[in-house]
Every structure is written in structure tokens, then in C-alpha cells.
Amino acid sequence: MVKYSYYPGNVARQSSYEVEDTIQPLCKTLGIELFEIVGYNSDGGNIIKQGNKDLQLTLNARNIALAEKNGHHIITACASAQGILHEALETFRNDPIALANANTVLSKTCGITAKVDEITTSHLLHVLVDEIGLDKVEDAVINPLNMDVACYYGPHMQRAGACGGDDAWNPNYMEKLIMALGGRPVEYKSKTSSVGNPSLLSLGDSVMKMTARVLNDAKKAGAQIIVSACTQSHSNLDSYQGKAGRVANKDTNIPAVN
């Protein structure tokens, strides 16, 4: 049994309840014990960062400090959360002043501080492939997927250090996982492109065109469904796919799931 501090991210318990409904039994089946980060807060979603970088860093320092109290490394099912947490850890380790400033706020408001010297953060995908092993995943399959699946990574965790042992430039962990589940991964050119979720309210049409490109590319490549490693980006791919298709004048009609 491997143990992790579980960070749900911004939407797993809001607009994407299916993530919470599936991650708990999945982890139990595969021997991953989740210890919730009690009292966790939003990581800022790279939206707060646009107006106040220090505030977003402090929000992440608080989550890190709470996870350190649990005594376990962090796991999340959201690529955005993984990328943001990793970036915060990297910033704090390279910039002691940034860490000191965040800890000053935390000490005054919460009575806690973050150390950041040992803790790590991982996406569930990387834990399944790197630590649990795809053989164990395959052995646990009851109903093989048997579908043509387009994998959407999102850009946040596709950077050195944030993507586990995967290739940051040409990732393939999701494709390997899909094959272990009995599905057929479909290659398409925009699988690591951004859909612009943090700019959804400020750059609406541009974001819709970015979203439409991903959906249309996946559909043209023959995918029956698109699976997102990012719960935040999933809202674009699912809830906004009709609008994205109209704005970009492209066929975007494809089921999108987390």
C-alpha cells in the first residue's frame, strides 16, 4: 500500500464530481491510500497569478504545509494542479525570499509554515505508470475499454520534473494506460496544446478556437472519445465544445471525459 496526501484540485468536487466518484475506488483497488489534505484551498488555477503572483504562491504554500503535516507526498488527478504545485515547489526551492514571504503570511493567518525540502507532487497518471505499474492495472481490468481514445494532456504538467518519467515533449503515459485498459489510443497533433482555460473570461473567442482545434483534431484522427488528464481543461473540452465549434466553425462533437 502506497500512501499519498490527496489534493482534489479546483473542480473535482464542484463541476466534475465523476473524478471524485472514481478516484477513491480506483485507488483502493490498486493499493493507493489517500490521506486528504484537510482544509485545502484552491491553487489559484493560474488565474489569480495573472493579478497577484505572490497570492497564488502563498495559496500553494498553505496546501504544501498541510500536506507536510500529513507526512506524505502529494497526489492529484488534475494536470493543472500538478503543474501549479510543481512550479510553486520549484519557485520556493530556488527563491528563499519567496518562501519566506509566503511563510510570513501563513504564520500570521494560519499558524503554519511550509518547509518544501522533501515533499513532492505527482499526477495520478504518473503514479499509476511509474509506481503501481501497468501490469497491475491491466490485471485489475474487468470490462476492457475497447474504444478509440484520444488522450489530452494539457500543457501544465508537460515540463521537466512535473511529468514523472514521461517525455515532456512527446508524452505517451496516457496512451500506455489506455492500452492497459483495453483501449486503442489515437495519435493527433494537438494532444499537448493548451485550451486556454485560465483565459476563458478574458479571451473568450481565442480560447474557443484553441479548444475547437483540440476537439476537431481528435475527431478527425478517428477518436470515439477524448480523455483529459486535466480536470480544469475538461470544462473547455466538454461544457464549451458546442460554443467552440460555432466560434471556430469546426466539428467539435465528441464525448469528453476526465
Name every feature range the model reports, one short phrase each:
Residues 1-258:
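Iron-sulfur cluster-binding electron-transfer modules in prokaryotic oxidoreductases
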